[in-house]
């Protein structure tokens, strides 16, 4: 297991109360040895005006996953802040849920890079993101 902080899924989900994460319906669903996953509904909260998943909602899911994964890689007295987010949208999604899978690309002392891939309910890749974070403290 790569994580320096040891939290349960319930503890991770509790951090979302009264935040954008909760408003969008994002729920952490898996914390594996080197992976963090979450789901987000594709509904009125996350649609753009034409009834499709809003790219900003996809970006919010990606940044949520990458930032939390980054936090799990810090020690007491440290935190992470996002420095760059890149998202490539591959496929439109109009309903159901999307699942985000976050994996590390680089875990340095001062910066991290995360790859977050979003999948629709049929397991098709709909968005690929990369998040850079800086370790503070």
From Swiss-Prot:
It is an enzyme of class 3 (hydrolase). The keyword Transmembrane helix does not apply. Its EC number is 3.1.2.-. Its main location: cytoplasm. The keyword DNA-binding does not apply. The active site is at residue 63. It is found in: Cytoplasm. Gene3D superfamilies: Hotdog Thioesterase. GO terms for biological process: enterobactin biosynthetic process. Keywords: Cytoplasm, Hydrolase. It comes from the Bacteria. It holds the Pfam family 4HBT. GO terms for molecular function: 1,4-dihydroxy-2-naphthoyl-CoA thioesterase activity. Pathway: Siderophore biosynthesis; enterobactin biosynthesis. InterPro entries: HotDog_dom_sf, PAAI_dom, Thioesterase_EntH, Thioestr_dom. GO terms for cellular component: cytosol. Coiled coil: none annotated. Homotetramer. Dimer of dimers. Interacts specifically with the aryl carrier protein (ArCP) domain of EntB. HAMAP family: Thioesterase_EntH. Required for optimal enterobactin synthesis. Acts as a proofreading enzyme that prevents EntB misacylation by hydrolyzing the thioester bound existing between EntB and wrongly charged molecules. Belongs to the thioesterase PaaI family. PANTHER family: 1,4-DIHYDROXY-2-NAPHTHOYL-COA THIOESTERASE 1, PROOFREADING THIOESTERASE ENTH. This is Proofreading thioesterase EntH. It comes from Salmonella paratyphi B (strain ATCC BAA-1250 / SPB7).
């Amino acid at each position: 297991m790569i994580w320096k902080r040891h939290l349960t899924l319930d503890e991770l989900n509790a951090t979302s109360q009264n935040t954008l994460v909760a408003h969008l319906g994002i729920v952490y669903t898996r914390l594996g040895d080197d992976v963090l996953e979450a789901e987000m509904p594709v509904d009125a909260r996350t649609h753009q005006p034409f009834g499709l998943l809003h790219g900003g909602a996809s970006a919010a899911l990606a940044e949520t996953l990458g930032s939390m994964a980054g936090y799990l890689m810090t020690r007491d007295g440290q935190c992470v802040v996002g420095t760059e987010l890149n998202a490539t949208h591959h496929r439109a999604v109009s309903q159901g849920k999307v699942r985000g899978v976050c994996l590390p690309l680089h875990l340095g002392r001062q910066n991290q890079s995360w790859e977050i891939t979003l999948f629709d309910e049929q397991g098709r890749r709909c968005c690929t993101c990369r998040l850079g974070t800086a370790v503070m403290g």
